[in-house]
């Protein structure tokens, strides 16, 4: 299967125009899109360890959720040089789908909404990020699901008692900033995401929003595993996971 055919398939599932402005999605490294791909590796991050593993495993197309470069850089030295050197010397194509994969139908946020069987789920933000709906059950049942499928030891900021059948917001990855806490406090009773800070915790307590930090990694990898299964069932090539 050619690299360009894989990219076309991914972009049909997670259209690039869904990505939020400034998100560095799409082809990251590589130029021969007519190359025949024999093994695809999938990972959350294009870390040096992931790229080294891709080389070791004979991966020739590396898909990552997070892009290789987020901010503009002025030179290619240190770790970024090491990453590029391995990718280019081994002719490994690197491709990323980030917020477009978060937002798209059956993407990472829909995977969380489906896990909790949210009633009437809708996008949490106008740009399509996150999901919010009614969780039909108790807070304890919600935590049991979280611990079983997402993270065994989530951080729970229980700012108030939660009635059954509560409004639950979910957002895969980084969602527990102070601005997000303030926004979601007007939308939901409970908020599951990742990357809680000390000041966000205090703000959640003050606003009466129950927050569950199941980590950036775990809230995204749950849906990424589903995406890997989807690719495996639709693409005629070997697909392996590299960091989950």
Swiss-Prot record:
InterPro entries according to UniProt: DUF34/NIF3, DUF34/NIF3_sf
Transmembrane segments annotated in the record for this chain: none
Residues binding a divalent metal cation 2, per UniProt: 66, 216, 220
Annotated keywords: DNA-binding, Metal-binding
GO MF entry, a single one: metal ion binding
Gene Ontology cellular-component annotations: cytoplasm
Keyword DNA-binding in record: yes
Entry binding sites for a divalent metal cation 1: 65, 102, 220
Domain of life: Archaea
Presence of keyword DNA-binding: yes
Family in the record: Belongs to the GTP cyclohydrolase I type 2/NIF3 family.
UniProt-listed NCBIfam families: YbgI_SA1388
Subunit structure: Homohexamer; trimer of dimers, that forms a hollow cage-like architecture.
UniProt function note: DNA-binding protein exhibiting the ability to bind to both single-stranded and double-stranded DNA.
Protein name as it appears in the record: GTP cyclohydrolase 1 type 2 homolog
